[in-house]
Amino acid sequence: SSPDEANQAVAEYKTTLNIQEGDTVDESITIPPQPQTSVVVMDQYTGEVKAIVGGRGEKTASFSLNRATDSHRQPGSCFKPLGVYAPAIDTGKYTLASLIEDSPYTYSDGTPVNNWDGKYIGQATVRYAILHSMNVCAVRTLTDIGIDTGMKYLENFGFTTLVSKEDDPAHNDYNQSTALGGITNGVYNIELTAAYAALANNGVYTKPILYTKVLDHDGNVILDNSTPETHQVVKDSTAALLTNAMQDVIKRGTGTAAQLANGMPASGKTGTSEYSTDLWLAAYTPYYTCSVWGGYDSNKPMENIYNQTWHEVMWKNIMDRVNTTLGLQVKNFTMPASVEQKTVCSVTGLLAVSSCPSYTEYFAKGTGPTQSCSGHYEEEEDDEDDDDKNKEDSDSQNSQDSEDNEDSGNSDQSGDNNNNSGNNGNNNGNNNGNSNGDSGTVTPPEE
């Protein structure tokens, strides 16, 4: 809300207080700038929080409020890589080349699941679904792998605000809308940053720390916090595959406004809650992980704000300064030995043969397709002469459907929040690269 709107609300409230002439009234009005923001910058290898911003504007009241650690907000599509695709790939049920049906779909209670752009393309690979933040694909995939599995991974990623069945058997986060970040309480910025830092650190989660040691006046160590808690939350191959897929988000997806000036690679995911109430970018370089949140303290929608990428620009400006100030050299993300490449058919997801439209994809070793595509041929018959009925076969390679021309500047609408839908058990994902039908064509990743 604007200061004028806030002052008007105060004036209206004061009319209800029945203040009489001669009464002494003491008032203090503080109006923080809106919308607000929070930022966390973390060293993904040590867990050290290098920078934290709890809000913007000069603090004149509520000195203890830190929005990065105290305010839980809806994460939107930032949850898709963590609660959907990380477990899907880590358990071996899906690969980046697996095909997912992208067509009209409903939650188990009958509520439609809508893609943020209102479009469907028939089939999409996991990589393409991440790139274009496709809601239907995310919900179908979580439903297929099991909501319990998704929740287990989210808990291992360090989120403490999730509502379990034990906490509330009737209203909890064990529902399909969790795939889109539609959860009961939202998440803290510092916890979302730590979760993405785990992907940046070969799948190793490190609990964030705000200090390393506390010394007394004689230099004796009173508190030693230099060795934070760690655990492996996903395989190094899973982390590498998601990192590679989410680089596409920054290169040509919903996070292009965050591209760094010096060519430093970045990988991450945007998130937008319903009506643009919350805007997120959680992303990392080979050095640091940073998450930026933006929104009104009052949960006022921001859907009418023209610039929906200001939080991405903020992320870029912060990380550009980090890279410049510290003199960080450009280096690329690396692939572990547990990952291999295979050439697959972009229509079926099977191993490509000479007649296939194909592309090269990364796989965790042992999870890629082993069956070869049968090829793509059409028979054409020449005109038959009564005396000589010779036939000539001509191969006609199927051309790939062109991909939807998505506007990469649009934010990704994550669907309704707090929609407690049960698991309907639909198995619409196609595992290990096998075909899921002929209802569409998948666009391969661009190199």
Map each language-model feature to its residues:
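Secondary-structure capping and boundary motifs in well-ordered enzyme cores
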Residues: 41, 46, 71-77, 118-122, ...
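Short coil/turn segments at secondary-structure boundaries
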Residues: 142-145, 152-157, 165-174, 207-212, ...
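Active-site SXXK
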Residues: 47, 74-100, 129, 194-199, ...
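Conserved catalytic neighborhood of penicillin-recognizing serine enzymes
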Residues: 93-150, 175, 217-243, 247-248
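Ser/Thr/Gly/Pro-rich low-complexity, disordered linker/stalk segments of secreted
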Residues: 372-447
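Mid-domain, small-residue-enriched loop/turn segments at the edges of structured enzyme/sensor domains
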Residues: 111-114, 146-192
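Sec-exported extracytoplasmic/periplasmic mature domains
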Residues: 84-93, 101, 105, 131-135, ...
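A penicillin-recognizing enzyme superfamily signal
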Residues: 1-31, 35-43, 51-53, 58-71, ...
